[in-house]
């Protein structure tokens, strides 16, 4: 299980994993780094819709994870 929620005031994000979910998430991160790419995680596919607590958090329905190589970050910082 991989789950992203906004906290009750909408200013923070909570990321919740079970044992399999954290392994999947690490694999996603390794893959986008290796491929110099990005990844979309969607509710109903990679992201769980399961309610895991009684708090007032809101499910995040879409997460985009982007890898920016260090050289790109230095270049854009220098250009600005």
Q: What is the predicted function of each stretch?
A:
Residues 1-80:
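Positively charged, low-complexity terminal tracts
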């Amino acid at each position: 299980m991989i789950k992203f929620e906004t906290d009750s005031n909408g200013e923070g994000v909570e990321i919740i994993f079970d044992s399999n979910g954290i392994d999947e998430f690490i694999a996603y991160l390794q893959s986008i780094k290796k491929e110099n790419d990005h990844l979309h995680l969607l509710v109903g596919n990679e992201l769980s819709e399961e309610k895991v607590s009684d708090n007032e958090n809101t499910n995040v329905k879409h997460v985009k994870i982007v890898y920016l190589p260090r050289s790109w970050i230095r270049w854009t910082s220098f250009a600005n």
